[in-house]
A protein has these predicted regions:
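N-terminal cap/lid segment of alpha/beta-hydrolase-fold proteins
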Residues: 1-34
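The feature captures the conserved acid-bearing segment of alpha/beta-hydrolase catalytic domains
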Residues: 138, 144-198
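Short amphipathic alpha-helix adjacent to the substrate-entry channel of hydrolases
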Residues: 53-76
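C-terminal catalytic histidine-bearing segment of alpha/beta-hydrolase fold enzymes
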Residues: 189, 196-239
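Serine-hydrolase catalytic-loop signature spanning alpha/beta hydrolases and amidase-signature enzymes
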Residues: 44-56, 75, 101
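Short beta-strand element of the alpha/beta-hydrolase
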Residues: 35-47
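Alpha/beta-hydrolase active-site loop
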Residues: 64, 85-106
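Primarily recognizes the serine-hydrolase "nucleophile elbow" in alpha/beta-hydrolase
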Residues: 96-160
Length: 239
């Protein structure tokens, strides 16, 4: 039987780092003592708890974490309990705890942090957009869902399209897939309109031929360039 697509290889070749396991967080530290800036990667969802392996073990997140480490930044991948649309508050609370765990690591500069959200995990970015903490130097979004699907019951707090009004000067790096699901693409357009209305600091990286999950579905130079560009943009904000 074919493996599920979420176990596809990461399309950008990178020497894999063996992560340190600190359940529910995997750390990808560069060599040496630091202190290093850190990027915290937040997977999408909702994901049923029986789906195994959990996201921090997926090739794409091993790739992102290893890529961060190769650039001299500590990568952290967090499993969070977003199992149904009703779970955004619980997942947000788990992430808040994870943020402090990563910041407390002696190898991490606690004031140079980026948080990078993917897909259906992106509504969780509302927690940071509503009130950006001083330690947050960059917020990244890759093929993000930024409003709830019709018919889903989601806590109204978790609406980045509204929360971006409070983002201030926070740098936001948004990677947009050109062949995105139409509804998701509409939420991205609404977010960008809302961001423009308050002059939010958004850098857009377009992947014109990319699908949702282009980083594991579209093995192309375009995909690789988009990943590399996004990583460079984020690192430039925290170093």
């Amino acid at each position: 039987m074919a493996e599920p697509t979420y176990l596809n290889p990461f399309v950008l070749p990178v020497a894999l780092v063996t992560p340190e396991r600190h359940d529910p967080i995997d750390l990808y530290p560069p060599a040496g003592d630091g202190p290093y800036p850190a990027i915290i990667f937040v997977h999408g969802g909702p994901i049923p708890p029986e789906m195994q392996p959990s996201p921090r073990h997926w090739p794409m997140f091993r790739g992102y974490g290893s890529l961060a480490a190769s650039r001299g930044v500590l990568g952290a991948v967090v499993d969070h309990p977003l199992h149904t649309p009703a779970d955004y508050p619980a997942a947000g609370a788990a992430l808040a705890e994870a943020f402090e765990t990563v910041r407390a690591d002696p190898r991490v500069d606690p004031d140079r942090i980026a948080v990078w959200y993917f897909s259906g995990g992106s509504p969780l970015a509302a927690d940071l957009l509503h009130r950006p903490p001083s330690w947050l130097r960059c917020l990244a979004l890759t093929y993000p869902l930024l409003e709830p699907f019709p018919g889903t019951e989601v806590d109204p707090h978790y609406r980045p399209v509204e929360a971006v009004a409070s983002a201030g000067a926070l740098p936001i790096v948004l990677t947009r897939a050109g062949r995105e699901h139409p509804f998701i693409a509409g939420t991205v357009a609404n977010f960008l309109t809302a961001a423009a209305s308050v002059s939010a600091n958004v850098r857009i990286i377009d992947v014109p031929n990319g699908r949702h999950s282009f980083d594991i579905l579209d093995d192309t130079d375009e995909s690789r360039t988009a990943i590399d560009t996004a990583m460079t943009e984020v690192i430039n904000k925290i170093t």
